[in-house]
Every structure is written in structure tokens, then in C-alpha cells.
Amino acid sequence: MSNTPIELKGSSFTLSVVHLHEAEPKVIHQALEDKIAQAPAFLKHAPVVLNVSALEDPVNWSAMHKAVSATGLRVIGVSGCKDAQLKAEIEKMGLPILTEGKEKSPRPAPAPQAPAQNTTPVTKTRLIDTPVRSGQRIYAPQCDLIVTSHVSAGAELIADGNIHVYGMMRGRALAGASGDRETQIFCTNLMAELVSIAGEYWLSDQIPAEFYGKAARLQLVENALTVQPLN
């Protein structure tokens, strides 16, 4: 046991940043509601940072904060604030002003090229063939996600479709993020912190012991999460 009641350690977390391009709270509220409806398992009750650097018109910050919070998102800080008065209002509400890393200047867009003839159809799968490390979040919108390497604890895989992990799975896997209850999770070594299909989830201690560390397939049966051997 430590001799001190607390211990400070550096750490890193992956957070979504909502860039506000409109100063009207009602417009922001509706836009966020629409976005959350597209991927409720991914965004519902998610912690977010609000970036206000693009706001040109004055904003009622109290109303804006209420509009965002009413969607279920949890505002944990604000970035991109250069206006002294707005900064004072934000800090008065107890929210920290955060500094984001410097963004690289965008490279000039390449000259447009004529479309190639006889192009092959796009495959609805996102493939990751490198290890997914702690703090990384990978999202595969409207498709399946395949990872051919290990997924570390603290990493997060999210897909609107199925998730396949052909390595040790220690992180979090959320399939069917947009609500598709027919999606499944396939792991060759199931040691996940959390598994979820369309919002139905298990934490690591809820995974049946006989499947922990084994090849497994997870799916919903009668709206309940189930697991079986992966043959």
C-alpha cells in the first residue's frame, strides 16, 4: 500500500472534439441529435471537448452548454477559445480551457485526375494490420472492421458492422455502433475489457470464464449478448 493518499501520474485519453460552426444553440442541439442517432453506441453519453475557434458571432454560452448537455453528451472542456469575454464565461461555469496540439498545415490538393476506367467496387471493410495500442480509437463507419494484430488494454474498436480480431483482444470492442443488432464480434483470443453489440455489453468480469482467453464468437440472441466457441 502507498504511503500517500494520492498519486499523480501522466496519462492520455482519446476524446471526441465537437467543432462548433454555428452560434445558435438550437441549431447545434438538433445537429448533435442527428449525429448521435447515426451511432448511438459510439456517441451516447460520450465525454466531449467543444472547439469554439470557428465561431464568429457572439454566443450565449449558458444556453449553448445546456443545448449540448441536453443531448446526453458530457462536456468536459473547451478548446480554441480566443475571446476573453467568452473565456471568462466558460471558466465561470467551471469548465477548463484546453489547448490542443498544433495542427499541421494542410498540403495543397493534388491536381484532379480523370477517373480510371473499369474501377473495382469498394470493399465494405476496414482493415488494420498493425497493433492497436492503448489510447487508440478506431472507428469503421458503415462497414466491418478487421484487425490482424493485437489490441492492447485501453484501446477501442468501434464498427457499424462486424468486428474481427485475429490477435490478442485486450481492449474494448463495440460492434453494431449504429444500432444493427445482426452484427457479431469474432476474436481468436478473447480477453477484452468490454464487448458490445448494438449497445448490449459485457465488462471483462461478465465474460464467461470458459471463453476467456479462447477463440470466441459473440452475437445477440433474443436481444441478449451470447458467446460461443469460434470454430
UniProtKB/Swiss-Prot annotation:
GO biological process, one term: regulation of cell septum assembly
Stored InterPro entries: CAP/MinC_C, MinC, MinC_C_sf, MinC_N, Septum_form_inhib_MinC_C
Alphabetical UniProt keywords: Cell cycle, Cell division, Septation
Gene this protein is translated from: minC
Protein name: Probable septum site-determining protein MinC
Family, similarity comment: Belongs to the MinC family.
Keyword Acyltransferase found: no
Segments for region (Disordered): 100-125
Keyword Ligase attributed: no
Subunit and interaction comment: Interacts with MinD and FtsZ.
